[in-house]
Amino acid sequence: MSSQIRQNYSTDVEAAVNSLVNMYLQASYTYLSLGFYFDRDDVALEGVSHFFRELAEEKREGYERLLKMQNQRGGRALFQDIKKPAEDEWGKTPDAMKAAMALEKKLNQALLDLHALGSAHTDPHLCDFLETHFLDEEVKLIKKMGDHLTNLHRLGGPEAGLGEYLFERLTLKHD
């Protein structure tokens, strides 16, 4: 059944939004896995755990925002299977941060591709929506992760476990 409110919302854009929702669901699931890995008693890095669980929440808010926009534009949300994260054992903080940065770069590219598709279909509402709610935040997050990786590498060395602990305590402390 077609929507009575749909206007200037292409089926290509609708499909790309559904694909992006799936990517955000996958990212949230991955960050949840990361967060609870670092919360384990044999890993015990509370600040790192908190950082990744906050990202899981942000991605949840992102996919809900995308789904709401999809409905407001007269599109239909089509849910797909969510794969389990590639890892169960995430290793040390730098390894996890590298995996997270790769995930964010993939999300950012999908957002840029959707923006380009919206521009090609002359959909200013979609472009404004992405610029307002997603694109700037992605760039800031990638920068933050890059900074964290730089600091983790600085703290590495023969006592890498101590460096990881200090990074967690001094950089990722939370209230």
UniProtKB/Swiss-Prot annotation:
GO CC, alphabetical: autolysosome; autophagosome; cytoplasmic vesicle; ferritin complex
MF annotations from Gene Ontology: ferric iron binding; ferrous iron binding; iron ion binding
Biological processes annotated in GO: intracellular iron ion homeostasis; iron ion transport
Domain Ferritin-like diiron: 7-156
Alphabetic keyword roster: Acetylation, Cytoplasm, Cytoplasmic vesicle, Iron, Iron storage, Lysosome, Metal-binding
Record's subcellular location: Cytoplasmic vesicle, Autophagosome; Cytoplasm; Autolysosome
Keyword Iron on entry: yes
Chief location of this protein within or outside the cell: cytoplasm
Top-level taxon in the UniProt lineage: Eukaryota
Region of interest (Catalytic site for iron oxidation), ranges: 54-61
Transmembrane segments: none
Residues the record lists as N-acetylserine modifications: 2
Disulfide bonds: none
Record-listed Fe cation binding positions: 54, 57-58, 61, 64
Pfam family, one: Ferritin
Keyword Cytoplasm: yes
Family per record: Belongs to the ferritin family.
Function (record text): Stores iron in a soluble, non-toxic, readily available form. Important for iron homeostasis. Iron is taken up in the ferrous form and deposited as ferric hydroxides after oxidation. Also plays a role in delivery of iron to cells. Mediates iron uptake in capsule cells of the developing kidney. Delivery to lysosomes by the cargo receptor NCOA4 for autophagic degradation and release or iron.
Assembly and interaction partners: Oligomer of 24 subunits. There are two types of subunits: L (light) chain and H (heavy) chain. The major chain can be light or heavy, depending on the species and tissue type. The functional molecule forms a roughly spherical shell with a diameter of 12 nm and contains a central cavity into which the insoluble mineral iron core is deposited. Interacts with NCOA4.
Protein name: Ferritin light chain
Gene field: FTL
